[in-house]
Amino acid sequence: MVQLYVSDSVSRISFADGRVIVWSEELGESQYPIETLDGITLFGRPTMTTPFIVEMLKRERDIQLFTTDGHYQGRISTPDVSYAPRLRQQVHRTDDPAFCLSLSKRIVSRKILNQQALIRAHTSGQDVAESIRTMKHSLAWVDRSGSLAELNGFEGNAAKAYFTALGHLVPQEFAFQGRSTRPPLDAFNSMVSLGYSLLYKNIIGAIERHSLNAYIGFLHQDSRGHATLASDLMEVWRAPIIDDTVLRLIADGVVDTRAFSKNSDTGAVFATREATRSIARAFGNRIARTATYIKGDPHRYTFQYALDLQLQSLVRVIEAGHPSRLVDIDITSEPSGA
């Protein structure tokens, strides 16, 4: 099962004979068996036929809608029919500080390890030793954290060191000097922000398919409109799925700084239509590729399949109350771009 990403060059999407039919003046017609699709993400304003929408809803496949320049608009999905006992257990676990802290430690530890693996995979002579040392120091203190506040402090220190290291890897013309959001202030931040948005929406859909509530998390604090559980789960995926993809787009010359524009009033930097297409296409290709994602499991999976394994393990963790049983998303044994 894969998530299909459709660029704004597409003008019509229809359904016939068990296949989703995508047509554009640029590429002509493409067909995809609907049973192979986990969902569809659309950019721009293509015409969608009623049979296509009905079939997607009947099969509980989400349709996510983004503007041409990558801003999320909403989604078309079936009503949430979550399993009530599971939701009660989820809420019950969030009221247990020890459970939340233990689960959050596993997430943060793996996030830092995956960030270190990404830096090492992309380093070719750059001086990132100090950043790696800082990340290792923070990692050593994660398990000693006595509260979520302490844990967030160590995670923040590691994140600062990680983005400092990324600053040595990103070409100078991209003017990347650290993470900036709302708005992104340089081309690199603009690309990863778009990627994180695509990843976040993808994970929300996966959470709901497993009858959990995406807005009830364990690591991130509640805030209106924030799917905190999606943010929790995506922490371990940011580096291998998004950051790696963006670094490779730059290294391969697929995008350059000419593909971005800056708002003179706000300083915000946004990708052009063509750059947004390239990023969305690269993200779609990345999550369709197989890799060894699960610690202790030599099998290669697509991102979507590995995400389902992660969520299945989270359901078991919630039901049994044992955070140590959460599947460990480990990219340290295989560079994420492999």
From Swiss-Prot:
<dbReference type="GO" id="GO:0004519">
    <property type="term" value="F:endonuclease activity"/>
</dbReference>
<keyword id="KW-0540">Nuclease</keyword>
<dbReference type="GO" id="GO:0003677">
    <property type="term" value="F:DNA binding"/>
</dbReference>
<dbReference type="Pfam" id="PF01867">
    <property type="entry name" value="Cas_Cas1"/>
</dbReference>
<dbReference type="InterPro" id="IPR042211">
    <property type="entry name" value="CRISPR-assoc_Cas1_N"/>
</dbReference>
<dbReference type="GO" id="GO:0051607">
    <property type="term" value="P:defense response to virus"/>
</dbReference>
<feature type="binding site">
    <location>
        <position position="155"/>
    </location>
    <ligand>
        <name>Mn(2+)</name>
    </ligand>
</feature>
<dbReference type="GO" id="GO:0046872">
    <property type="term" value="F:metal ion binding"/>
</dbReference>
<keyword id="KW-0378">Hydrolase</keyword>
<feature type="binding site">
    <location>
        <position position="220"/>
    </location>
    <ligand>
        <name>Mn(2+)</name>
    </ligand>
</feature>
<dbReference type="InterPro" id="IPR042206">
    <property type="entry name" value="CRISPR-assoc_Cas1_C"/>
</dbReference>
<dbReference type="GO" id="GO:0043571">
    <property type="term" value="P:maintenance of CRISPR repeat elements"/>
</dbReference>
<keyword id="KW-0479">Metal-binding</keyword>
<comment type="similarity">
    <text>Belongs to the CRISPR-associated endonuclease Cas1 family.</text>
</comment>
<keyword id="KW-0255">Endonuclease</keyword>
<feature type="binding site">
    <location>
        <position position="235"/>
    </location>
    <ligand>
        <name>Mn(2+)</name>
    </ligand>
</feature>
<dbReference type="GO" id="GO:0099048">
    <property type="term" value="P:CRISPR-cas system"/>
</dbReference>
<comment type="function">
    <text>CRISPR (clustered regularly interspaced short palindromic repeat) is an adaptive immune system that provides protection against mobile genetic elements (viruses, transposable elements and conjugative plasmids). CRISPR clusters contain spacers, sequences complementary to antecedent mobile elements, and target invading nucleic acids. CRISPR clusters are transcribed and processed into CRISPR RNA (crRNA).</text>
</comment>
<keyword id="KW-0051">Antiviral defense</keyword>
<keyword id="KW-0238">DNA-binding</keyword>
<dbReference type="GO" id="GO:0009274">
    <property type="term" value="C:peptidoglycan-based cell wall"/>
</dbReference>
<dbReference type="InterPro" id="IPR050646">
    <property type="entry name" value="Cas1"/>
</dbReference>
<comment type="subunit">
    <text>Homodimer, forms a heterotetramer with a Cas2 homodimer.</text>
</comment>
<protein>
    <recommendedName>
        <fullName>CRISPR-associated endonuclease Cas1</fullName>
        <ecNumber>3.1.-.-</ecNumber>
    </recommendedName>
</protein>
<keyword id="KW-0464">Manganese</keyword>
<dbReference type="InterPro" id="IPR002729">
    <property type="entry name" value="CRISPR-assoc_Cas1"/>
</dbReference>
<keyword id="KW-0460">Magnesium</keyword>
